[in-house]
Regions:
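Terminal RNA-binding accessory module
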Residues: 2, 383-476
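Short flexible coil/turn linkers enriched for glycine and charged/polar residues
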Residues: 181-184, 194-196, 293, 303, ...
Length: 476
């Protein structure tokens, strides 16, 4: 059958179309493998957030279904960079890796290099790749990762760079293969895109508008995961609190959580990220009454100054954020709160910075991701006046980091001497007679154990707090 006949014979409906192209690519991969006398390998390098990590599991699932074996490094036959573009230097990292790969490809001209993810959604980036990195074979974006097999087939046939970047889509393709990193826990996308347009953030421009999956599809996926041995799921979205608003039959995130809670065999439910402006009383009540939702909430602050929050377009004030924390603590006194904070946003004064420090002292976070403001081309904040001098930002960042770490080391101690449930995740990276796991509140615990414990929830005595983690002992 000719190439044209194969494409003409492809189903038009998804996911049948992609299943068809996976089969076609598999024939090509098997033929190449026979020629080389070894299996063709693939390697995915993932940059950025948990949404990207989950996307990479889907991409790897497609590649393995299409006949590739997973390789260990960039010397593989098919190398894919799933990119992040939240910060400008994330782009520079990828350009650096592409420069390195040009040498690798000279030695192995049959290898293929692909780029996808948020960085690919920027037209100027795609133009630069096409001009300066001609050894790249495949470029696609965030909206059409499900089309990898079809695009790969096109590249095999055309033998030239394939570019397929969509500006936006409402399409969500279900039931494609996924290769999970962990057999006992999994991320689950419940929605895609973002409608918030924070003035410093590129995400709505590269991930598109909010699109929610149907609750039935989410439940079906989680039931399948549980049947396959998963005990913990992480529900993922740029702003999970907005889930369900754009569905034909609207549903709240709290209602979705209550449905997920009913799935037999599922032990733990996590979710991220929550936008403070959309955190409802219904959600707080659902968390309070749940036996499965973990005792942890990531609630990005970004700044403690109401003036800076206004410029960031965050749509809440310092006072509203603190009132929300008060509600959460009243409902769940033991809840672990973590956050994101940006230092040095344009126009931030010393007084604004002290407002942030004040919130940190009042909330007492278990941990915080702290960032120096990074001017992001294409966002309103990049053009704002009063960009802060580097030395001032560095000084504030160091002061904030010390405050966060000092408080966190005190807060984490609160369970010292108690026995808690721990989901064991892996062999300890520093001591192979120990294992590492997490409490419901996401704190890491190290204790003596072996691989037979991985994936199990066990009782552990938290013997000693060591800053951000515990040393413990298994309760037999």
């Amino acid at each position: 059958m000719t190439d044209k006949n194969i494409i003409a014979g492809a189903p038009t409906e998804e996911p049948a179309r992609q299943q068809y192209f996976m089969e076609q690519v598999k024939k090509l991969v098997e033929a190449e493998s026979a020629k080389k006398g070894r299996p063709l390998t693939c390697f995915i390098n993932t940059f950025g957030c948990q949404m990207n990590a989950r996307d990479s599991e889907k991409l790897l699932g497609i590649l393995k279904e299409a006949g590739y074996e997973e390789g260990t490094d960039e010397n593989s036959d098919f190398v894919l960079y799933n990119t992040c573009t939240v910060r400008e230097n994330a782009n520079l990292k990828v350009y650096g890796r592409l420069g390195y790969l040009s040498g690798v490809k000279r030695k192995n001209p049959d290898m293929m290099i692909a780029l996808c993810g948020c960085m690919r959604q920027e037209p100027e980036v795609v133009a630069k790749i096409k001009k300066s990195y001609r050894h790249v074979d495949l470029i696609f974006g965030t909206h059409n990762i499900f089309k990898l097999a079809e695009l790969l087939y096109e590249r095999f046939m055309e033998k030239k760079m394939v570019v397929d970047v969509w500006e936006g889509t409402n399409e969500i393709v279900e039931e494609l293969p996924i290769e999970r990193k962990y057999p006992f826990k999994s991320g689950v996308n419940i929605m895609f895109g973002c409608n918030n347009f924070c003035s410093y953030c590129i995400v709505p421009y590269v991930r598109g508008r909010e699109r929610s999956r149907e609750p039935e599809d989410i439940i079906k996926e989680i039931e399948g995961l549980v049947a396959d041995g998963v005990v913990e799921v992480m529900l993922l979205g740029q702003n999970v609190n907005s889930y369900g608003k754009n569905l034909e039959q609207p549903i709240t995130f709290a209602e979705l959580l209550r449905r997920v809670e009913k799935i037999e065999g599922l032990e733990r439910i996590r979710f991220m990220t929550s936008h403070p402006k959309d955190l409802s009383d219904e959600l707080i009540e659902t968390m309070k009454n749940s036996k499965k939702i973990c005792s942890h909430l990531h609630l990005p602050l970004q700044s403690g100054s109401s003036e800076i929050l206004k410029r960031m377009n965050r749509k809440y004030s310092k006072e509203q954020y603190l009132a929300l924390v008060e509600k959460l603590r009243a409902a769940m006194p033991d809840i672990s709160l973590t956050t994101d904070i940006i230092v040095g946003f344009p126009g931030e004064t010393e007084e604004d910075f002290e407002e942030t420090m004040d919130v940190v002292r009042k909330v007492r976070y278990d941990s915080a991701f702290t960032f120096i403001y990074s001017k992001r081309t294409g966002t309103p904040a990049a053009a704002m006046p009063n960009q802060i001098p580097e030395d001032v930002v560095k000084d504030r960042f160091d002061r904030l980091l010390k405050e966060v770490q000092d408080i966190a080391s005190e807060v984490v101690k609160r369970h010292e001497g108690t026995v808690q449930k721990v989901l064991v995740e892996e062999i300890d990276t520093h001591e192979d007679s120990f294992v590492t796991g997490r409490l419901s509140n996401n704190t890491v615990v190290h204790f003596a154990g072996d691989a037979s414990l991985i994936g199990k929830i066990v009782d552990v005595s938290l013997d000693e707090a060591k800053g951000f983690y515990y040393m413990g002992s298994l309760v037999k």
